[in-house]
Amino acid sequence: MIPKKTKLKSREIEVPGDKSLSHRSVLFAALSKGKSKVTGFLEAEDPLNTMSAFAKLGLKVQKVKPGEYEFESPGKNKLVSPNVDLDFGNAGTGIRLSAGLICGLPGINATLTGDNSLKKRPMGRIIKPLSSMGASIVGLGEKETAPLKIEGKKLKGFRYESPIASAQVKSCLMLAAISSETDLEYSENILSRDHTENMFRFLGNKIEQISPLHFKIKPPYVLNGGEFRVPGDISSAAFFLVLGVLAKEGNLLIKNIGLNPARTGILTALQSMGAKIEIQNKRIECGEPVGDLKTYPSNLKKSNIPESLIPSIIDEIPILSVAGFFAEGGFEIRHAEELRAKESDRIHTMVSNFRELGIEVEEYTDGYSFDGTSKKSSEVWTRLSTVKKIPIQSYMDHRIAMSFLIFKTLSGLDLQIDETSWIETSFPGFEKLLESCINE
């Protein structure tokens, strides 16, 4: 067995605001005529890039204090074409959702771009259905990738059966329909995150729910300014959940975390592995369930992760894989080919880094598997514990960098991560918070 070494201070912590909700708060503020207020906004590069993009379209932005912003929009029909390209940096959510919204605004012409990593990510998944709605959108990069050139126009009603469970595709098409005041009927095979639907309802709109996987929306839409409170991001909390359950001693109470059922797959997965995590103070805020999460040191074991759970843990699979290394019997993830379309090809990234550590990993087109706390992995750990400066490649991916920082903390290995600046895209202050939890 791999020995548990990490001792934690028993303390309360908070993680930054939910990235998905921070993006969406800007988008709905831009659509809604008048003033909107957001508290708990994630002041990380990705959502700030989305905010900057819509400021160029005519959204007035005022920072009240850290994490709190006031927006004023002239209304969707009075937004203006930007005179420069809209740079979304590394924000896949930002560019895909914004593309849908802008496609439905007649007279608005814009080019949406991003960094080198974003320019490699697939955009055909939104270009095809948007084009079927009548949108003028072209991917100027190879294989329909960004930059995206858009000429906004009035779109037509559309019925779409999504071949993938993707909240980004669903939200993109919803925002296109909302901005263009047209109807949308949407269905998917597995339930994806429903933050856009919740915020849409919170503003006073109705959704005709035909089944849990099938819905309709139709105008007129209610688009008045609102006040949004963004809870802590469970994807960010996931790193500290794994830290807490794999520590030798100490408890963490992670406050004010969004507990949307489409996002709590990480809790289901960890608890099925034997993790003891307690939900406290559960409540509803701005249409989203919120609560506090308390961790207890636990002994983990291998657990089968069903295909139906994959959409709700897709961003947490790297840190869940780290937990799997400490689990009796190891770890296996399948049906997760979507990992290859993230900030990096996360299947390749995790496999190559684990192999660099000497861990035997089986790679599949849709996932990977490896032994956990077996004799063989214990031997690997014993050998690595004497090695200095073991290189880890982050591949410009914030979640890979954070996952291996947690791995480094738990294992005591001298891992040298090539670059950690990517963490700023989602979790500013991560390393400082991590250090503050350790009881030396």
UniProtKB/Swiss-Prot annotation:
It is an enzyme of class 2 (transferase). The keyword Transport does not apply. The active site is at residue 315. It is found in: Cytoplasm. Its EC number is 2.5.1.19. One of its GO terms (biological process) is amino acid biosynthetic process. GO terms for cellular component: cytoplasm. Phosphoenolpyruvate binds at residues 19, 92, 121, 168, 346, 399. Its main location: cytoplasm. Pathway: Metabolic intermediate biosynthesis; chorismate biosynthesis; chorismate from D-erythrose 4-phosphate and phosphoenolpyruvate: step 6/7. Pfam families: EPSP_synthase. GO terms for molecular function: 3-phosphoshikimate 1-carboxyvinyltransferase activity. 3-phosphoshikimate binds at residues 19-20, 24, 166, 168, 315, 342. Keywords: Amino-acid biosynthesis, Aromatic amino acid biosynthesis, Cytoplasm, Transferase. CDD domains: EPSP_synthase. It catalyses: 3-phosphoshikimate + phosphoenolpyruvate = 5-O-(1-carboxyvinyl)-3-phosphoshikimate + phosphate. Monomer. Belongs to the EPSP synthase family. HAMAP family: EPSP_synth. Catalyzes the transfer of the enolpyruvyl moiety of phosphoenolpyruvate (PEP) to the 5-hydroxyl of shikimate-3-phosphate (S3P) to produce enolpyruvyl shikimate-3-phosphate and inorganic phosphate. This is 3-phosphoshikimate 1-carboxyvinyltransferase.
